[in-house]
């Protein structure tokens, strides 16, 4: 969206990170597979992240449509030996979002309309074949539900722990 950078500039200093909605685009001819992803992301970015932010739990980043404040990424880098993006992680964007919360930052989910009434966000296509879908879901399940226990533990307040249960259910 043409206003993304302006919105990032306006909001990133207010919390530590900004996540714009990911607006799912269904791949023609892939109603069931691509459509399934569209439904999941619409649910996550339309409701779950909004509730998560309201509860004060850390927000996972989507890997697209996000901006991170330099000070918070610097704090994370210091804690991580100069490497804020962990290349050993299967879900580095998800983990980075939670680490922003652990470092004292707050991610803002910015559901804001432009002057024409259009949602400011990033459109994204999702896997459209069974093979690509299984590969993606396996990475997410392994990275969040299984490795997340060891990599991130169960830290945070009750809202954070509740959302970790939500994330890690399989």
What are these regions (language model features)?
Residues 55-57, 115, 119-170:
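Basic/Trp-rich segment in TM-proximal cytosolic loops or flexible interdomain/linker regions
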Residues 1-115, 120-123, 129, 135-138:
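Internal catalytic domains of large membrane-associated glycosyltransferases
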């Amino acid at each position: 969206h043409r206003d993304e950078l302006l919105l990032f500039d306006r909001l990133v200093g207010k919390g530590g990170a900004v996540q714009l909605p990911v607006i799912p685009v269904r791949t023609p001819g892939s109603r069931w597979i691509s459509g399934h992803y569209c439904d999941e992301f619409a649910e996550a970015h339309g409701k779950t992240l909004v509730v998560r932010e309201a509860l004060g739990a850390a927000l996972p980043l989507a890997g697209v449509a996000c901006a991170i404040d330099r000070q918070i990424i610097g704090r994370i880098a210091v804690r991580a030996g100069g490497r804020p993006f962990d290349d050993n992680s299967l879900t580095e964007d998800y983990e980075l979002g939670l680490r922003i919360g652990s470092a004292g930052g707050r991610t803002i989910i910015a559901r804001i309309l432009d002057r024409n009434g259009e949602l400011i966000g990033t459109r994204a296509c999702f896997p459209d074949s069974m093979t690509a879908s299984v590969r993606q879901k396996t990475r997410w399940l392994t990275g969040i539900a299984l490795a997340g226990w060891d990599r991130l533990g169960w830290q945070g307040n009750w809202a954070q722990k509740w959302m970790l249960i939500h994330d890690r259910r399989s």
